[in-house]
Every structure is written in C-alpha cells, then in structure tokens.
Amino acid sequence: MKAYANIKLASQPACETIERDPARNRLREGGAMADDDALFQKGMPIRREVLGPEYVDASMARADEFMISFQRATTAWAWGWAWGDATLDRKTRSLMNLAMLTALNRAPEIKLHVKGALNNGVTVEEIKAALLHATAYCGIPAGLDAFRAAHEVLVTEGALSKP
C-alpha cells in the first residue's frame, strides 16, 4: 500500500453534525476528537479494498493542486469516518450507497460502487433487489439509469453474461 502520511487534509467539515476544532485540525465525533490525518490513514486502505487499488491510486495520482483537497476530504470523511465505523458491515454500506446513488441519479458513481459492492461480497441478486427497492421510492427514470449503469459493470466484471 502506498503511504500518504505526508498529505495535509482540507479544513472543511463533512457535514453539520461534525464540528471542527480549527486550532487542532481535528473533527469532533460524538465528543471524541478524531484527527483528519488519522482519518485519512484509516480511510485509505478501506477505500483501496472497496474500490480497488488501481482506481484509488490513479485518482490520487491525477489530482492536481485543486483536486487533491477533494481526494483528501473524500478519503478522510467518507472512507475513514463513515466507512471506518464498525457499526454496519461493508455489504450493508454498499447496498445503502447504491440506493442513495440511485436517488441522486449518479450513474458514474453507481458504476464505481457496483464494482465496490461486488468486492464487498454483495451478490447480483442483492444488487438487483437494492436497485428495485430504490426504484420504488425514487421513480422509474432514476431506477432505469441505475439498472443500466449496474448492468454495464456486472457484464464487464463477468458477473452477468452479455445479452
């Protein structure tokens, strides 16, 4: 695994429920302090395991001075803070992501997270069930886009045969 210890993290809070202590570059999590750098270091291996090291390393390598802040924040907050919490297992988190991304109609991210879901042991039937459930609440157009995106990845990854 690549070492990213020397990267400084952005100073924006991830959401309203997280308070920042600007003097210490830390996030407050339920009364406890979590250092951004520690969250980044915790998040990087999780991100690489779920999305694949090739994808993550390429994202980090092509991030210029402007985009590196986004990459750092994503790794610390989404992967270190949210995915790093042990309350939910990775399969559950993957299914939640697919449902939320369907609601947001974010096909490129659905593709990425379908591959991540497969890496986390989610079955094709579970992916289909999550997308159908999201379709019932988000509407047919969003569901159709999600199914198309997922289908493309499932065929590419060999989880489905080509029609």
Located regions from the model:
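C-terminal structural segments of small proteins and small subunits
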Residues: 138-140
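Mid-chain, well-packed structural core segment of small domains
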Residues: 103-128
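Short, Lys/Arg-enriched N-terminal segments with co-localized hydrophobic residues
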Residues: 18-32
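Short alpha-helical scaffolding segments that buttress acidic/His motifs in well-ordered protein cores
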Residues: 74-78, 95-102, 130-135, 146
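Acidic, glycine/proline-rich low-complexity segments that act as flexible tails and inter-domain linkers
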Residues: 29-91, 119, 145-163
